[in-house]
Amino acid sequence: MTPVAAASPDYARRINIVQGEHRVEHDPEAVLCTILGSCVAACLWDPGASVGGMNHFLLPGDAHAQAGGGGAAMRYGAYAMELLINDLLRHGARRDRLKAKLFGGACLMKGLTDIGRLNADFAERFLAAEGIEIVGGSLRGERGRRIQFWPVSGRARQTLLAADQPALLRAEPDLRTLRAPPPSGAVELF
């Protein structure tokens, strides 16, 4: 029998990330996985500290009304990003070495507000404002994606889903009813 490499994609320790979650790992055998429609996943890592993480977020339904300004929806997005960044810093990452890959933000339902574009725009603006370099990824479009991210190396793999994905559409929440949580204080920025 031929030995299998520890970081082989078929034998890695897979960790699924669902909407609203984030995860930070320093295990070279870990691979963070998610499925995205209009949601966005930010994959951040520090190559010097061999640590990385992924989040999976969707701006609440009132984001289209607040796209140009602050508001609760943008605070929710900033909170999701800061949770990931702060957790990376707690695990030894340095902010000045962080790299990013962004995925998702698809427009899955024609005729409705393109919440995927708003999610993608937000993620790009946030990282630019934080001075975190975006080195890759795949945003927008009309198809969902399956993402695998190796947090230690920063390697990522994307598989586009078939154009007709009714199961994925059912899994996405009704964007008109999803609302931002009420503000509960300031977000601590490092």
From Swiss-Prot:
GO terms for biological process, alphabetical: chemotaxis
Keyword Hydrolase: yes
UniProt entry tagged with the keyword Hydrolase: yes
Catalysed reactions, semicolon-separated: L-glutaminyl-[protein] + H2O = L-glutamyl-[protein] + NH4(+)
Keywords assigned by UniProt, alphabetized: Chemotaxis, Hydrolase
Top-level taxon of the source organism: Bacteria
Leader sequence residues: none
Entry-linked Pfam families: CheD (PF03975)
GO molecular function, one term: protein-glutamine glutaminase activity
Record EC number: 3.5.1.44
Family: Belongs to the CheD family.
Described purpose of this protein according to its UniProt entry: Probably deamidates glutamine residues to glutamate on methyl-accepting chemotaxis receptors (MCPs), playing an important role in chemotaxis.
HAMAP family referenced in this protein's UniProt entry, alphabetically: CheD
Designated name of the protein: Probable chemoreceptor glutamine deamidase CheD
Organism of derivation: Acidiphilium cryptum (strain JF-5)
